[in-house]
A protein has these predicted regions:
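Membrane-proximal helix-turn-helix segments that form the acceptor-binding/catalytic region
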Residues: 12-32
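Carbohydrate-associated surface elements
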Residues: 38, 58
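A charged, aromatic-enriched C-terminal amphipathic alpha-helix characteristic of glycosyltransferases
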Residues: 70, 198-201, 205, 209-242
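Conserved catalytic-core segment of nucleotide-activated headgroup transferases in glycan assembly
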Residues: 75-121
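Short alpha-helical donor nucleotide-sugar binding micro-motif in glycosyltransferases
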Residues: 140-145
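Aromatic "clamp/platform" in nucleotide-sugar-dependent glycosyltransferases that forms part
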Residues: 153
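Short hydrophobic beta-strand element within catalytic cores of glycosyltransferases
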Residues: 170-173, 180
Length: 243
């Protein structure tokens, strides 16, 4: 569930009570798993080494079946098609509003496609798709893109990145622990906001080369294996067998 951003932040008032609950659960023998290294590190720094294990997110089997049906798109026609995806496009924590407006200001150099509710972005070079609940339609639309731009500062191990990368769509992500961790798994890197504005004007193969240091075909093959749901399943099975 994606909750709207709160107007009053009460989190700091609740932290002590929640940490006590975690300590009580650990005393009962509860085991904790995080999909990301940076969250596990933060947890272990509070509650002790090895208290939280890591199993990265992967593509679920239903999505795997959808991805298998999508033909790889090596070259797109016309100007670069750039996707921005979020549940609520107004929320600056998930979508850097200023960065999107700077991309819009590139005019006819790019075609910006937004997927999500309440898009505040309107311009001649913007196509608003709305919130797409059908995973097959969303993946099919993303498959036609040259890149996905990801600027969230509040994610853990974002599944949309795994999904886009799995179908061979390069991800141009601004610096964050979450994006860095996901991209590293397929040999990619995060970039500055200034670099985003340069990269979105390139072709799909050029973006793959710049972010992943390899050809589009090699990047696609590497990513397909890196975010496999089968790998995630095997890690969970192994975890439960060793309890």
């Amino acid at each position: 569930i994606n909750y709207p951003p709160v107007k009053i932040d009460r989190a700091h008032q609740l932290v002590a009570g929640k940490r006590q609950l975690f300590r009580e659960m650990l005393a009962l023998g509860c085991q904790f798993i995080s999909p990301s290294q940076h969250v596990a590190d933060a947890f272990n720094s509070l509650y002790g080494p090895g208290r939280c294990r890591i199993i990265n997110n992967g593509i679920d089997m239903a999505t795997e079946a959808i991805l298998a049906d999508l033909p790889p798109v090596r070259e797109t026609q016309g100007k670069p098609k750039i996707a921005v995806v979020a549940h609520d496009l107004r929320y600056d924590g998930k979508t850097n509003q200023q960065l999107v407006r700077e991309m819009m200001a590139l005019g006819d150099k790019i075609e910006l496609h937004t997927f999500g509710k309440f898009s505040p972005f309107t311009a001649g070079n913007v196509v608003n798709h709305g919130f797409e609940t059908d995973k097959r339609k969303l993946m099919s639309a993303l498959n036609q893109m040259d890149a996905l731009v990801f600027s969230s500062r509040v994610d853990n191990y974002p599944l949309i990145l795994c999904e886009a990368l799995s179908i061979g769509v390069p991800v141009i992500a601004t610096h964050s622990d979450a994006a860095r961790e996901v991209l590293q798994k397929s040999g990619g890197k995060t970039v500055s906001e200034e670099e985003v504005l340069q990269l979105v004007q390139l072709s799909k193969p050029e973006i793959a080369q710049a972010i992943f240091g390899t050809t589009l075909a090699e990047f696609s093959q590497r990513s397909r294996a890196a975010y496999s749901g089968q790998q995630m399943l095997e890690e969970y099975v192994n975890f439960y067998q060793n309890l």
